[in-house]
A protein has these predicted regions:
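Anionic-ligand binding patches
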Residues: 1-4, 10-166
Length: 166
């Protein structure tokens, strides 16, 4: 069985291919099939993931999997949320993980409530018209550190501390 991954992120493909292979599923990047990147016009993770999955299914005729994820900071009213990937650009920074972390930490200066959640929503559709998309959401709640810690991880990993894990 072939499923298209509605993402142009090579890191996501590298993580997911080994998970699907034992199931006899060949996961193919949408870019390998000429699928244009989908817009993400919605204000929720689930709506954006669904539109991306349907876009990939429409262009390929294959089942599709998509995700949308971001950082939701309590003291910032849930922001940056669905705008996480581009959050730093509103402050004049280039779009990079480093600059996104920098922008969030700058906005959090002086805040005592540092609770935040990394949220990820994954949607799978069997076809573009699938009336029952499979939707899964997860969240990891942590405290934002005041500066990056450690040498591993990507995205917001270096500024997230989970007290129960030390």
């Amino acid at each position: 069985m072939k499923i298209v991954l509605a993402s142009n992120n090579p890191g996501k493909l590298a993580e997911l291919v080994p998970l699907f292979a034992p199931l006899g599923v060949e996961l193919i990047a949408q870019s390998d099939l000429g699928v244009p990147e989908s817009p993400e016009p919605h204000r929720t993770f689930v709506e954006n993931a669904l539109i991306k999955a349907r876009n990939a299914a429409q262009h390929t005729g294959l089942a599709a999997i998509a995700d949308d994820a971001g950082l939701c900071v309590d003291a910032m009213g849930g922001l940056p949320g669905v705008d996480t990937a581009y959050y730093c650009t509103q402050f004049g920074y280039d779009k990079t993980d480093y600059n996104n972390r920098r922008a969030v930490l700058e906005q959090m200066q002086g805040q005592t409530n540092r609770r935040a959640a990394l949220v990820s929503t994954i949607v799978a559709v069997r076809s573009v018209q699938d009336p029952e998309p499979l939707i899964a959401s997860g969240r990891v709640v942590a405290e934002l550190t005041r500066e990056p810690v450690g040498e591993h991880g990507f995205g917001f990993d270096p500024v997230m501390f989970i007290p129960s894990l030390g």
